[in-house]
Amino acid sequence: MADITTEELEELENEVVSKDDNIKTMQEFVSPESLYQELIASVKKYHPSTDISLIEKAYKTADTAHKGQVRKSGEAYIIHPLCVAIILAELELDKETIVAGLLHDVVEDTVMTVEEIASEFSEEIALLVDGVTKLGQLSYDADKVEVQAENLRKMFLAMAKDIRVILIKLADRLHNMRTLKYMTPEKQKEKARETMDIYAPIAQRLGISKIKIELDDLSLKYLEPEAYYDLVEKVALRKSVRDDYVQSLVKEVSKHIENAGIKAQIDGRAKHFFSIYKKMVNQHKTLDQIYDLFAIRIIVDNVKDCYAALGVIHEMYKPIPGRFKDYIAMPKPNMYQSLHTTPVSYTHLRAHETRSNL
């Protein structure tokens, strides 16, 4: 890897967990009260009329229960449940889930009982907290083969009678991964492997791509640090910058597709580090041989429009030879049908892949 200063590495590292990505980077020793206000603002954003009194009660209860406890970072323990609750609010979950997120560690780490939670809050919230506590008791052996990891994932899902229990556990793991740097190197690798093998796949199964992507990238950071930082350095652009670039492409493509009279839904994304790394490993390629660091998806109603959209793209950008795939003429075994092409973009940034799907 080329020479790079510590300051530059830290700046590049922040692109994975960035406020620009609407993912909160919690500064060390941040005020619990400021985080609480952030939580309330987040809840009010998607549920303006919600009664916050129960959330406030849960915050005060958790703060009292965890009084005197500190995390490995040295910050007050209450910071963790607050951050978990904020992640849940970003998923726009109901008030009861937010409350359970604030209380999720009180049974395991304090003298408070499930019965007391049921009495002071509700049976519903008590069951959520109890479910999270029981999931935390599942142990994972990183040396297990994949089939055993899959069995543990199934057990994880089966034990949670309420899907909200899993969502709280995912939020809990995400914040723990964001603050993993305070653990020993051995514990970092252990937690990262468990996250990649168990938690990220579960997030994917539940369709929570935002959490799945961040869990993957954070796991890669600790499991393969050289590869991770090499990607961070070589990709060179903050995710916010890459996302802005993709959105500019989406806007440009949308204009041309509309002018062609094609009805379509168009979106795009910048591929995350783990996705790029996995492709490099599986296909035995270097980063310079990975052409699709960006992807734009065009969804149309019929085959005719699919080919027409492809024609529009090829008029806009020159296609890279050998990168066109016709899954309409030859569908995948699961009957997936689309057209894939990789054109050269009009800026200095790397090429992007465009998919026109039925």
What feature does the model see in each segment?
Residues 2-350, 356:
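Active-site helical microenvironments for divalent-metal-assisted chemistry
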